[in-house]
């Protein structure tokens, strides 16, 4: 199988900027693009294949068709037909809004199959920019 290329899903946000469009050399007019979802199996926001014989199919359709040969046997057994990662570019032109993602246990209580797993790549930023991450917050 040849490598798959996916159409990006551009997300405008209140904190987004214009670096993603320039970085990806896109010829579009969209403002405040804070995220470009490169690979997503999130229902309702699934990546669409842009090339080859799978062109036009969603990522989860590809997984459902190719099963273990696409994800590997262990991953397919664990995640089924839903691709388990969300991979995206972030352009935070301002401070981000608070992001809260449930773990698997909390997601199950909310009727969802699993928590949200992401991978981010932050585009080049201003010299004085500082990343902030709060993990394992608990109510007092």
Model-derived features with residue positions:
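Conserved small/polar residues in nucleotide/adenosyl-binding loops
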Residues: 135-140
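Transition-metal
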Residues: 1-134
């Amino acid at each position: 199988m040849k490598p798959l290329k996916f159409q990006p899903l551009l997300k405008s946000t209140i904190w987004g900027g214009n670096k993603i469009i320039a970085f990806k050399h896109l010829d579009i007019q969209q403002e405040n693009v804070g995220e470009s979802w490169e690979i997503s199996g999130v229902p309702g926001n699934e990546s669409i294949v842009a090339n080859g014989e799978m062109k036009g199919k969603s990522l989860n359709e590809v997984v459902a068709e190719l099963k273990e040969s696409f994800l590997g046997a262990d991953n397919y057994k664990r995640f089924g037909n839903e691709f388990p990662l969300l991979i995206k570019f972030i352009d935070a032109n301002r401070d981000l809004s608070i992001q809260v993602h449930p773990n698997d246990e909390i997601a199950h209580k909310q009727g969802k199959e699993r928590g949200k797993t992401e991978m981010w790549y932050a585009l080049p930023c201003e010299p004085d920019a500082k990343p902030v991450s709060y993990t394992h917050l608990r109510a007092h």
